[in-house]
Design a protein with these regions (language model features):
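Catalytic domains of riboflavin
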Residues: 1-373
Length: 373
């Protein structure tokens, strides 16, 4: 089945229709119904709970959550994909139990009204708001961000109603199931990867500030400085060779005082990628890029040591939320530098919709592999 273009999805969102959006097969590998929150009707909620069967959620921007004084459900997010649930809500007026399709639609419309205020809603309730990351799918490639992006691109309030699609037997619907669902109900269907690609093509969210040659302990590198538009943090890229000419050795690195200054190993005894080790490894390659992601704050030393000393299963992403939230920035910088195929200095990780950035990981290289040589 041929997927629909992002332009087609945006047009349907603008017209008040639902669309299906799928994420990468190596992430949640699911599809959600998405529609503009400002257009939601009782029959739309009824369709979601009858045919999709997932949890009906309301995606909101950080600004809207602040406007409604909505706190996050938990301070420390341990969810696998770091979805930002706020406290559940109900409209303060015009409802009885709040669970009917009509009353859920009323709660949603109340929350996204232009002049909505905290007193218009109460907690808890039967609608589950999700706070999107600033920067949308270029920052975190989840359905939460995709819903806000699609509605914003449609010229509407950046808020959407989303619901996971579940098969008749209770299992999650995967792409073949979702294509059948879309055809059966006459819905447009697309991917978050395509939405990322659309935004990368039509928007500039990371700007290059400067370029200069610097000399390091490991030789000369080209130093590029970047900044996200609307964000004061500075990101750096150290480049060796010409990334456009072939497979490039890449490290996307966030500063950690324990790992980078004290050079402690992980709790399981394995070696962590320090800034020094990554730079040395890249210097030994024909082509390499080290992207240093700036942060608005540095975690305190005690917390950093505790975090590094906690055993974490390979495929658990709970401790990787910071990496999931910043990989989009690193990916944009890599694309600006011409990187396409890369050897990634990292343990195997599932990055959100990486294909949307036209990036391909051909090999993962762990720090232990390098130090064992």
């Amino acid at each position: 089945m041929q997927l629909n273009s992002v332009e087609e999805l945006i047009a349907d969102i603008r017209a008040g229709r639902m669309v299906i959006l799928m994420d990468d097969e190596d992430r949640e590998n699911e599809g959600d119904l998405i529609m503009a929150a400002s257009h939601v009707r009782p029959e739309d909620i009824n369709f979601m709970i009858t045919h999709a069967r997932g949890l009906v959620c309301l995606t909101l921007s950080r600004e809207r959550c602040k406007q409604l004084n909505l706190p996050l459900m938990v301070d420390q997010n341990g969810a696998q994909h770091a979805t930002n649930f706020t406290l559940s809500i109900e409209a303060a007026e015009g409802i009885s139990t709040g669970i009917s399709a009509a009353e859920r639609a009323h709660t949603i419309r109340t929350a996204v009204a232009a002049h909505a205020k905290p007193s218009d809603i109460v907690q808890p309730g039967h609608i589950f708001p999700l706070m999107a990351q600033p920067g949308g799918v270029l920052h975190r490639a989840g359905h939460t961000e995709a819903g806000c992006d699609l509605t914003r691109l449609a010229g509407l309030e950046p808020a959407s109603v989303i619901c996971e699609i579940i098969n008749d037997d209770g299992t999650m619907a995967r792409r073949p199931d979702l294509e059948v669902f879309a055809e059966k109900h006459g819905l447009k269907i697309g991917t978050i990867a395509d939405l990322i690609h659309y935004r990368m093509t039509n928007e500039q969210t990371v700007e290059r500030l400067s370029q200069e040659t610097i000399n390091t302990e490991y030789g000369a590198f080209e130093l590029y400085k970047y900044r996200e538009i609307g964000n004061p943090d500075i990101h750096l890229a150290l480049v060796k060779g010409e990334p456009r000419q072939g497979v490039t050795t890449v490290r996307v690195h966030g500063f950690n005082p324990v790992r980078d200054l004290l050079k402690l190993n992980k709790a399981d005894g394995s070696t962590a990628w320090s800034l020094d080790l990554a730079l040395r490894t890249i210097s030994e390659s024909d082509r390499g890029v080290l992207v240093w992601i700036g942060q608005d704050h540095l975690e305190d030393l005690g917390h950093a040591i505790h975090h590094l000393n906690q055993p974490m299963p390979l495929k658990s992403n709970a401790a990787l939320s910071q990496q999931y939230q910043t990989i989009g920035v690193g990916a944009q910088i890599l694309r600006d530098l011409g990187v396409e195929k890369m050897k990634l200095l990292s343990s195997p990780l599932r990055f959100n919709a990486l294909s949307g950035f036209n990036l391909e990981v051909v090999e993962y290289i762990t720090a232990d592999q390098v130090t064992a040589k």
